[in-house]
């Protein structure tokens, strides 16, 4: 049985990754799961300089998921490269870095710092950040800005570049086409949906940041629809995620058009989910007579 996939030039031993922001740097979970056995660990979002993150509360549980407004708390790219990457390299973890910038120039600079670093397999771009130079509009909501960010990063690195698409748009295909035009090697989708909650006793928003990102099973139908749409129109491999909590969910994503899947919120519930889910995928493939995971990709379009 062949579980290997090629995600835009990144060779994965299996098609199950863990999503950025839900698995730390991979090392935090090492008491529960061997991170090197996961297809890829997409590490915590990294910025050029250290960031303290948003004021609390930062997380709020919803009936079918959770809202988070962490605010990209992280020690900065230099600390990641100096302290975390060598330990991941020792364990032979397939690492995909995740970077977030305040400007196109910052994305390009971080890409240049990652270029040539042994142990980095690719770069995921968090483009759900406000563009400080353009009045705070999110990079990922404007097709031309998406194209510019991807193109600027591609100029600075030979690593595969994977923009993570925001679902908070009216036309996801237009955004995906712009990313492809900028030179993206693959697409990661989807990021969180914007949301909020209100405490009726305090009569104010629950989250310190007021707004947050909704993740978990609630967003799965949205993710599936968007992946299905993009698969039909854009010739790039897709890393699909959004509400995957079991192997049945993952299989739906493959059939919609995802080459690989990423587990996010589910990691908080079950740290071993990625590998348990992989076993479920294998069992399904055996029962259904599939010899390669690639046979499942996009099969719902046939």
UniProtKB/Swiss-Prot annotation:
InterPro entries: Aldolase_TIM, DHO_dehydrogenase, DHOD_1B, Dihydroorotate_DH_1, Dihydroorotate_DH_1_2, Dihydroorotate_DH_cat, Dihydroorotate_DH_CS, Dihydroorotate_DH_I. GO terms for biological process: 'de novo' pyrimidine nucleobase biosynthetic process; 'de novo' UMP biosynthetic process. GO terms for molecular function: dihydroorotate dehydrogenase (NAD+) activity. The gene is pyrD. NCBIfam families: PRK07259.1, pyrD_sub1_fam. It comes from the Bacteria. This is Dihydroorotate dehydrogenase B (NAD(+)), catalytic subunit. Its EC number is 1.3.1.14. Catalyzes the conversion of dihydroorotate to orotate with NAD(+) as electron acceptor. Pathway: Pyrimidine metabolism; UMP biosynthesis via de novo pathway; orotate from (S)-dihydroorotate (NAD(+) route): step 1/1. It is found in: Cytoplasm. GO terms for cellular component: cytoplasm. Binds 1 FMN per subunit. Its cofactor is FMN. Substrate binds at residues 44, 68-72, 126, 191-192. Heterotetramer of 2 PyrK and 2 PyrD type B subunits. PROSITE patterns: DHODEHASE_1, DHODEHASE_2. Belongs to the dihydroorotate dehydrogenase family. Type 1 subfamily.
């Amino acid at each position: 049985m062949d579980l290997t996939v090629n995600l835009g030039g990144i060779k994965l031993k299996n098609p199950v990754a863990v999503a950025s922001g839900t698995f730390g740097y991979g090392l935090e979970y090492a008491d529960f799961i061997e991170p090197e056995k996961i297809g890829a660990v997409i590490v915590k979002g990294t910025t050029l300089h250290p960031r303290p993150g948003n004021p609390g509360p930062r997380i709020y549980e919803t009936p079918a998921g959770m809202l988070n407004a962490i605010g990209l708390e992280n020690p900065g790219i230099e600390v990641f490269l100096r302290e975390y990457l060598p330990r991941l390299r020792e364990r032979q973890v397939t690492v995909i870095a995740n970077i977030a910038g305040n400007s196109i120039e910052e994305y390009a600079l971080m890409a240049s710092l990652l270029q040539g670093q042994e142990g980095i397999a690719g770069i995921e771009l968090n483009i759900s950040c406000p563009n400080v130079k353009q009045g705070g509009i999110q990079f990922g909501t404007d097709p031309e800005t998406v194209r510019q960010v991807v193109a600027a990063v591609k100029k600075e690195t030979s690593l595969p570049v994977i923009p993570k698409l925001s679902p908070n748009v009216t036309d996801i295909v237009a955004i995906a086409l712009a990313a492809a035009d900028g030179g993206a090697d693959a697409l990661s989708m989807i990021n969180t949906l914007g949301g909020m909650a209100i405490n009726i006793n305090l009569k104010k928003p629950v989250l310190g940041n007021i707004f947050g990102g909704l993740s978990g099973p609630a967003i799965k139908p949205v993710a599936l629809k968007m992946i299905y749409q993009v698969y039909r129109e854009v010739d790039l491999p897709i890393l699909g995620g959004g509400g995957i909590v079991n192997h049945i969910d993952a299989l739906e994503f493959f059939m919609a058009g995802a080459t690989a899947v990423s587990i996010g919120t589910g990691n908080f519930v079950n740290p071993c989910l990625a590998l348990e889910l992989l076993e479920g995928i294998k069992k399904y493939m055996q029962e259904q007579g599939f010899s390669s995971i690639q046979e499942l990709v996009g099969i719902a379009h046939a």
